[in-house]
Regions:
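Short aromatic/hydrophobic "clamp" motif used to bind/position activated sugar donors
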Residues: 53
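N-proximal low-complexity "stem/linker" segments adjacent to membrane-targeting elements
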Residues: 1-24
């Protein structure tokens, strides 16, 4: 895979998209101005013609070194999804930048056409289908200053994800119990 094999899908409602200036000219770019992030990304995939798709936010900047590294990762892991690490404790990627083959998208299905959190839900479906997520530190890509999301929206997102994937609750509880068992001194539990 080379740069020319990638289409960058950028959802935006801004007249000037900062990200475009750091995308090499040999790449294809599809800017989508649909209402929700999920719908815009899905429309971008439909309009793209390349084997590889990169989701990118409209307010980031890539370095040539980052793109070279991502291409190397993709060539070594063609059946994985590569992206920026989510916010702890989430094991999922964020769509500020995410790269994958079109065939993976087709297998997982389109993103939910919501405003926020669509990539987390998509990554959950991806892992359930056996795809590996390769996380790159978020700091690898410059993110221009912007307004932060509201805490209440993050809580709504968690409840929405749990309503779609209730098995996450059980998996989370199992992980907590496992960590407690592995990290606690046996002395703590003696009477």
């Amino acid at each position: 895979m080379q740069l020319k094999d990638i289409t960058f899908v950028i959802p935006t409602n801004k007249p000037k998209v900062k990200t475009v200036g750091s995308i090499p000219t040999e790449c294809s770019i599809v800017e989508c101005r649909e209402y929700t992030q999920g719908k815009a990304r899905n429309e971008g995939v439909k309009k793209s013609k390349t084997e590889w798709i990169a989701f990118a936010d409209d307010d980031i900047k890539f370095t040539p070194e980052f793109l070279a590294y991502v291409i190397q990762l993709a060539n070594n892991n063609p059946n994985s999804i590569i992206g920026l690490q989510g916010y702890s404790p989430s094991p999922y990627l964020i769509s500020r930048f995410m790269l994958f083959k079109r065939s993976i998208y087709d297998d997982i299905g389109p993103l939910k056409e919501v405003r926020h959190g669509e990539e987390t839900e998509w990554c959950i479906r991806a892992t359930k289908k056996g795809y590996k997520l390769i996380a790159i530190p978020r700091e690898s890509v410059y993110h221009y200053p912007h307004e932060k999301g509201k805490f209440k929206n993050e809580i709504k997102l968690i409840f929405w994800l749990l309503s779609l994937h209730p098995d996450l609750i059980i998996r989370g509880i199992k992980k907590v119990i496992y960590k407690i068992q592995k990290s606690s001194d046996d002395i703590e539990y003696q009477l």
